[in-house]
């Protein structure tokens, strides 16, 4: 898919250990001249961890994308009626978020963005970041 001139939502959930690598991918995406709207789950938006300060990640995303972070269900809800995204990328997508998506639960900014975007029949790309043992059920 040629991304120049396309509008892309880039949603991040709480797999904090992957944030530095994911932000590098956002930079690559920005280099394609796509118009990027960052979306962060409430947890990703507000939680400081050993991998970095939330405010630093938010600031960096806004600088790269040139748009404010969508960070609430109310803000994400607008994606549906306006149908302004051509593509929604969820990276990293935690196992918890994946389970919510699979069951139609839209109680966070990211899951609501996905629901609203899918309403328009447009593609969602999910990059799962979770422990493989969680996915296959091994203890």
Where are these regions (language model features)?
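A cross-family phosphate/adenosyl-ligand binding-site feature
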Residues: 1-139
